[in-house]
Regions:
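Alpha/beta-hydrolase fold catalytic core
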Residues: 15-16, 23, 28-113, 135-137, ...
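Short beta-strand/loop motif that positions the catalytic acidic residue
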Residues: 305, 311-313, 317
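Gly/Ala-rich beta-loop-alpha elbow adjacent to hydrolase catalytic centers
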Residues: 185, 189, 193
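Conserved HGGG/HGGXW glycine-rich cap/lid loop of the alpha/beta-hydrolase fold
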Residues: 103-149
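Conserved alpha/beta-hydrolase catalytic His-Asp/Glu region
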Residues: 70-72, 218-225, 239-306
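Active-site loop/oxyanion-hole signature of alpha/beta-hydrolase fold enzymes
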Residues: 140-184, 200, 357
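Flexible "cap/lid" loop of the alpha/beta hydrolase fold
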Residues: 198-199, 203-244
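Catalytic active-site module of serine/aspartate enzymes centered on a nucleophile-bearing elbow/loop
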Residues: 32, 42, 335-376
């Protein structure tokens, strides 16, 4: 069994950092306020009162959104960051099947980059990494089958093979494989990306797998043991990766992240509110990808991966054991491994700058090697 990413974690990290800064500012104002009050002229006070009245409505609207509709605030957050980073949202169709994706840039002399997110996440989980990637790269982040804006159908094949076929349809629709592209996937997305590279070698010029699922370990870690117990007891409503309360959401965040932080109840509630309408689908998907058909698809196909491959893994991953990196390195001929200290399963969220740098450096080394071969 395996698992995936913390959805919305970049929002949480940003919030916690801002809270720390606000705390320092609050101490400063608390110390200085008596002096300010004694010196402030009544007219100046009145001016601030009038200005405060002018700002009251938007401030109240923000506070109301935070307290009453935190899920709306989360959606606004992603809209804002997509806009800031220049990521445009588009749709493309294969027959009657809709794919939703975001992109930046246009295909050029450098390989395009296709990014596949993890279980129960969406294309926007990559924004924290996109922020640190060069703007001259052509980036494409797609919603995986059944997620966010991509079609969700009860007839869809949600197995790893089924998802690989859907991603290939997406690639064909965009003509992304007109020239081999660089493929990146994390967790479940890493599982799909690895199998894709094995099935469609001519599409891919290089591969980055970030703590991918789909490997068979000799011993199960504590988390996998717990999942097996839940599966044996048919208690699928208790899967830790599918929270339905703020408390369960907090537990999932602690499981997937090495960083420990306290998230406000309103944010936790907002994250749960966003997920609850989709939880039945997540349960169906989860059971499909841990089934006998899909469970070890990457393991069964890793020796078929022939392109230069990069493995990135957090050393403190509690979900998928870091020893998986060594397994892949032994089976893939042209493979380099990057292990990150003080990092859990959510590598993309915990270490976005480092992840982006590793990817850019890897692409540069692969590109230089291929150029040297052409000269020879």
């Amino acid at each position: 069994m395996r698992t995936w990413e913390i959805p919305h974690a970049n929002l949480i990290f940003s919030f916690c950092q801002s809270q720390e800064q606000l705390g320092k500012k609050a101490v400063f104002f608390e110390e200085c306020l008596p002096a300010l009050k004694s010196r402030m002229d009544l007219d100046v006070v009145n001016m601030f009162v009038i200005a405060g009245g002018t700002l009251a409505l938007p401030i109240l609207a923000f506070v109301a959104s935070f307290l009453l509709w935190p899920s709306a605030l989360i959606k606004i957050y992603y809209w804002y960051w997509r806009r800031t980073l220049g990521m445009q949202v588009c749709y493309v169709y294969h027959e009657d099947y809709q794919f939703c994706y975001s992109f930046r840039g246009r295909p050029g002399h450098k390989p395009s980059i296709l990014m596949l997110h993890g279980f129960s996440a969406h294309k926007d989980m990559w924004l924290s990494v996109v922020k640190f990637l060069p703007k001259n790269l052509h980036l494409v982040c797609v919603d995986m089958p059944g997620h966010e804006g991509t079609t969700r159908s009860s007839l869809d094949d949600l197995s790893i093979d089924g998802q690989v076929k859907r991603i290939h349809q997406f690639v064909e629709c965009l003509k992304l494989n007109k020239k081999p592209f660089h493929l990146i996937g994390t967790s479940m997305g890493g599982h799909v990306a690895g199998v894709y590279a094995a099935y469609y070698p001519s599409d891919v010029c290089s591969l980055s797998l970030v703590c991918p699922a789909g490997l068979q370990y000799s011993t199960d870690n504590q988390f996998i043991q717990r999942l097996k117990e839940l599966q044996d007891s048919a208690a699928i409503e208790k899967i830790p990766l599918i929270p339905s309360t703020p408390e369960e959401m907090s537990e999932m965040l602690q499981l997937c992240s090495y960083v420990r932080f306290k998230v406000p109840q309103q944010i936790l509630q907002g994250l749960v509110d966003v997920r609850i309408p989709h939880n039945n689908f997540y349960r169906k998907l989860f059971l499909e990808i841990v089934s006998e058909k899909s469970r070890y698809s990457l393991h069964q196909n890793m020796d078929k991966i022939k392109v230069p491959t990069q493995i990135i893994w957090g050393k403190q991953d509690q979900v998928l054991d870091v020893s998986g990196a060594d397994m892949l390195a032994k089976s893939i001929a042209n493979c380099q491994v990057e292990l990150l200290e003080n990092c859990g399963h959510s590598v993309v969220m915990e270490r976005p700058r480092k992840t982006a740098k590793l990817i850019v450096d890897f692409l540069a080394s692969v590109h230089n090697t291929s150029n040297n071969k052409k000269l020879d």
